[in-house]
Design a protein with these regions (language model features):
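Alpha-helical and His/Cys-centered functional microenvironments
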Residues: 9, 31, 65
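Intrinsically disordered, low-complexity serine/threonine-rich segments
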Residues: 16-17, 37-40, 250, 254
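Bacterial N-terminal signal peptides
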Residues: 25-35
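Cysteine-centric redox/oxidoreductase cores and disulfide-bonded domains
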Residues: 152-263
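Bacterial N-terminal signal peptides that target proteins for export
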Residues: 3-8, 14-26
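Extracytoplasmic thiol/disulfide redox context detector
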Residues: 40-154, 213-228, 233, 262-263
Length: 263
């Protein structure tokens, strides 16, 4: 398990922001070059010539690009920090709003709320799932466990489809049973498994199919929340004001729980 400060968890997020800033700076330079040209000159300029002019400006003034990237990074970091602070504050003062319609199990009315950002195709999430089951069984009446979808689709092509199937199951009150089946059979993720689990849970299959189509909005809300917090990997956990990530062990979470209960 890795204990982390929420605002220090996403170097990948800020690297992506830097790349975006660099592209933006290049675009601004190109626009500036066109603005300096007369209409006739702009029309006659060739792409290679424009590229050479841009390169000359960069060679003469590399600090302009660096300053632009740094300014953009700082702006993005400030926005993420503000979102994180607002999230943690809301978790303390308006817990129900943070939970929203997300699946919740355990001691639903507990003051100790463990929010899990997870991906059904993530192997570390599958390991963490086993630990969380042990935690809820060992500490009944102490913790409310909340599931937030964060499918990492660029590296896990089945994650979104699995998330939609689980969301559809939640509309029939079977999220946690469906979630458990997905993680238990993670090596079999695919349409056959989604249908098989639905049948074994005696779901209304017609409603299940309709709800899979409708699942995107709710899942995107979870993804947007995760991205606004600067998260870039799974699993990630927030328990009251404490945060940690990775394939956690039961003793690790219990240590965090003890710390939370003392505060």
């Amino acid at each position: 398990m890795r204990r982390v400060q929420l605002w220090a968890i996403a170097p990948t997020f800020f690297l992506m922001a830097a790349k975006k800033a660099l592209k933006l700076a290049m675009l601004l330079l190109c626009l500036a070059l066109f603005a300096w040209s007369t209409p006739a000159q702009a029309a006659s300029q060739t792409s290679p010539r424009l590229e050479e002019q841009v390169l000359q400006i960069i060679r003469k003034h590399p600090e302009v690009i660096l300053e632009s990237v740094q300014a953009y990074q700082q702006q993005q970091q400030q926005q993420v920090q503000q979102a994180q602070q607002a999230f943690l504050q809301d978790l303390k003062t308006n817990t129900k709003a943070v939970i929203g319609e997300s699946p919740t199990t355990g001691a639903i009315d507990s003051k100790v709320v463990l929010i899990e950002f997870s991906d059904f195709q993530c192997p570390y999430c599958a390991e963490a799932h086993k630990t969380l089951k042990q935690l809820i069984e060992k500490h009944p009446g102490e913790i409310a466990l909340v599931y937030k979808h964060f499918p990492l689709t660029p590296i896990h092509p089945e994650a979104m489809l699995a998330a939609k199937a689980a969301w559809a199951a939640s509309q029939q009150g079977k999220f946690w049973e469906y979630e458990d089946a997905l993680f238990t059979q993670q090596d079999k993720l695919g349409e056959d498994l989604y249908q098989d689990i639905a049948q074994k849970l005696n779901l209304d299959l017609e409603k299940f199919e309709d709800d899979r189509i409708l699942a995107d909005t709710a899942i995107q809300e979870d993804i947007q929340l995760a991205e606004s917090l600067g998260l870039s990997g799974t699993p990630f956990f927030v328990i009251n004001g404490e945060t940690f990530s990775g394939a956690v062990q039961l003793s690790d979470i219990e240590n965090v729980l003890a710390s939370v209960n003392k505060s």
